[in-house]
Structures are given as C-alpha cells and as structure tokens.
C-alpha cells in the first residue's frame, strides 16, 4: 500500500476551497442569457464549445490532489442536479460555491461546523416548502415554449420546436434529439403506435409507389405463437371475407403453408391481408402484444390463457383507423381501444418504469408508454458545422429536460428571482444557538448568488441589481437579456420549480459535507526516479558490428 499525505483543519479547508473555486469559476461564466462560452480541449477532433455547466464541470481535473478533491465534490453537485432535473447545473454550482466560501470563513472564525450545517439544512427545508407555494402550473404551449427558450440560452426556435413536439405527442410522449442533415432544426413526429417489424412478404405490398402496405379500417389479429398451419386461420378468414375488411396479423411468426396461402389469397383479391412479426422478445413481446391489444380493443390469442386460434372469432380482433407497413416498420394509427383502459395501462407502465433499476428497462418502458399515450417526436438539430452541432444539441437536450421538469412540478419566476423571494419570505427559522443562526444567514445569502452572477455575466454590478430586485415584490426581477426590470412571468422568464429545488438541495447537501470536513487524505505519487534502471543493456554496444551484415 502506497504512503498517504494527510492535511488537517485549516490547511485542508484552504486547499479544498481552492479546488472548489477553480471549478465553480469556470462553470459560472456560462450562467444567464449573456453567459459566455467555455472551450473544451479534446484529445482528437475539434475542441468543444459549450455553455452547459455540467459539460464544463466534467472536464475539470486538477493536478493538486487535495484541490482536486474539492473540485470533484462540486462536480458531484452539477452531476446530481443534471441527473435529477436535466438542468440547473450552473445554478447548483454557484449556490454550492457561495455556501462553501461563507461556511469555511465562519469555521475559520471559530464557529461550530456541525451547527452551521444544521442551520443551512433548516433554511433549505424552509426554502423548498416556500418554493412549492410560489410554484405555478405550466400546461399551456406558450409557457412550455418560454421555459425551453430560457433553458436554451434565449434561443426562441428551440423553445418553440419543443413546445410543438409536446403538443403533438402529449406530455407522456417520447421526444428524442438527433443530429440533423439541414441547417435548420426539424421536427419529425410519428403519430400512433410504431414498432420495428416490417411485412413478412413483399407480395403484401399494395402501394408500389411507396413500397408499403396500407390497410384502411383493418381488423387486427394478435397471436402469441408461430402460425404455420392455414387451418388455424380459416374460421377468421371466412368471417372476414363476409365483412370485406382487411386483416393485419401480428404473431411471433407466420411461416410455411400459412404464409404462402395468405400471399395467394391477397394477390387474388379474395382477402386483403398482411402479416408482421410481433415486436420484442420473450416477456417484452408478450407485454407489447398486450399493449397493442389494449390500444386496438382486441384480445391476444395465447394458449397459456386457454385461447386457441381455431376458435377465435371477429370479436377477439382489434381494429384501427389505419395501418401502414413498410419493410422495416409497422404503424397503427387511431386504435379503437377504450380510453380508460389505455390510461390505466399507461399508469401501470409508469409505475414499472419508476420502480425499475435498469436504465435500459426504464428506456424501453418509457417508449411503450409513449406509443400508447400518443406517439414519438424526433427533433433533428440543424447546424453549419460539427462544433456548432454538438453545442446546439446539448442546449436542445437541456431545454427538453427543463420543459419536462416544468410540466411535472410547475414554474417559478426565472433569472434567480424565485430564490431571492424565497429568502425574504422564510423569516425566522427556528434555531437553538448563534452558530445555527449564522448557518441560516449563509444559506439565505447564497440564494442571492445566482441573480448576482447573471447580472455580472451581463456586465452589470451584481450587488446593485440584487438590491434593486430585493426592493421589489412578487415576480419583479432583472431581465439580463435586454437589461430591463419588470414582471418576470410577463416577460416569459420562467424556471422549472424542480430545477430550482434540485439545485438548492444538492448544493446545500454537498456544501454542508465540505464545511464539516476536518482532514483530507491523499496518495503520495510514486517517484518515477525511484524505478530500477535497465542495467545490463550496455552490452548492446556491440551491435555496432552489425554494419557488416549489409
């Protein structure tokens, strides 16, 4: 085991604070509408230009191991805020820096670190409760667009495209962000339920110009097994022939005689039919078949629940307004399932997603939920260069997380105003001694730090702006984008409550741990000079004689 170096008391705290300041100073320049860019060096390719706090934080590693410990702890603040709400990483870093700086000053002056931490914790609990009181519901498209715009550093096009996507696929719908091919951002929406299974035979195609199968108001047969014997399908096909409606078969597989007979019947125009494989594998396939059944108002024909294909009737079939099948995908549009059952199924899947510990399972469950709830939207980010593309894509992802958080917990006045109002409304927090009281003061002072930093980045004097805002009431605040004061909600400057709450909670949690740190232990680096030399290689000098080998 290698030797360790240990720092105690003030020596440890000074080093730790130095690391906190290096990371926080690099991150906080990105805050607000007039925040600056940070350029990140990459080992290969062009450097990355970003205004995303967590991206900057992740790149920072310091040479001094004790300073690096401080930096890594603040990096954890940004990371946790990003995981919880997807945004607010810079705000969390600014809050943490303020609490740590003031807290360590108080410790150096002889105050009890544990009481300071208790005071900070009490203030934050009161602040979170007050934030919930200030929060307003965010449900209309305009408010969603405003939240997206603010999070994307005042880029209105990003806010609008996210609001449109949410309007099209619903609050539970899946919205993904991809790199586009054009210069402008594009929105691609797949409405209805789409799964990645295409037609089993090209002979089912009835739209040769697009190479697809289109079925209008079809019946949908769902079978949880392989179908190879046509006799099993005869009762259904005979019933269908009388209705004159088309049929979509979704089964584990359709093969051999069954597939050949369906193709022949389809080509002769006796029955309009198409067959696709069921999506997924194993238990996931069973679950997705059940999803389709609920969406279309049908029943999954499965032998394990005592249903046989030969005995199936038209009542067991689902229906939809339209089905489109390409060689890769099947889309069921406007299934005729009962709305109450669909909502119950979505709620059930949502619970499973929340309880799941696997990121992959969570993602798949959210996809299923979206397909039932409305559809999938893809935002294709457009840019002129690869460097701009990466920067813009990161902003779109941030804005998307922020709008989801806003829909979930509501919004408060943006621009750091909500925290200033919360600090003024908390009033007297119950404490048992002067040190705890000072801890409360530290937390309340830190709540002004984001507003001060936004003003500083806009070229204004932070303390002057903070005083002007404190003298106002309600949503009155400073719009750094155009250097004016007014009602933040009316100006469309909104922050998701969840983002502000998460930033405050994570910042105070990690900062509290740093204030109560009394010793730091780091590894002493191995001295490279101490390694054994490569003795004995000197004899290689005789190799000079190899010249005669030529």
UniProtKB/Swiss-Prot annotation:
Keyword entries, A-Z: ATP-binding, Chaperone, Cytoplasm, Isomerase, Nucleotide-binding
The keyword Acyltransferase is annotated on this UniProt entry: no
Molecular function in Gene Ontology: ATP binding; ATP-dependent protein folding chaperone; isomerase activity; unfolded protein binding
Catalytic activities: ATP + H2O + a folded polypeptide = ADP + phosphate + an unfolded polypeptide
Cross-referenced InterPro entries: Chaperonin_Cpn60_CS (IPR018370), Cpn60/GroEL (IPR001844), Cpn60/GroEL/TCP-1 (IPR002423), GroEL-like_apical_dom_sf (IPR027409), GROEL-like_equatorial_sf (IPR027413), TCP-1-like_intermed_sf (IPR027410)
Subcellular location: Cytoplasm
Keyword Cytoplasm assigned: yes
One cellular-component annotation, GO: cytoplasm
Enzyme class of the recorded protein, top EC level: isomerase
Regions crossing the membrane: none
Any Pfam family matching the protein: Cpn60_TCP1
SUPFAM superfamilies: GroEL apical domain-like, GroEL equatorial domain-like, GroEL-intermediate domain like
Amino acids binding ATP: 30-33, 51, 87-91, 415, 495
EC numbers, comma separated: 5.6.1.7
GO biological process: one example: protein refolding
Family named by the database record: Belongs to the chaperonin (HSP60) family.
Function summary: Together with its co-chaperonin GroES, plays an essential role in assisting protein folding. The GroEL-GroES system forms a nano-cage that allows encapsulation of the non-native substrate proteins and provides a physical environment optimized to promote and accelerate protein folding.
Subunit and partners: Forms a cylinder of 14 subunits composed of two heptameric rings stacked back-to-back. Interacts with the co-chaperonin GroES.
Protein name (record): Chaperonin GroEL
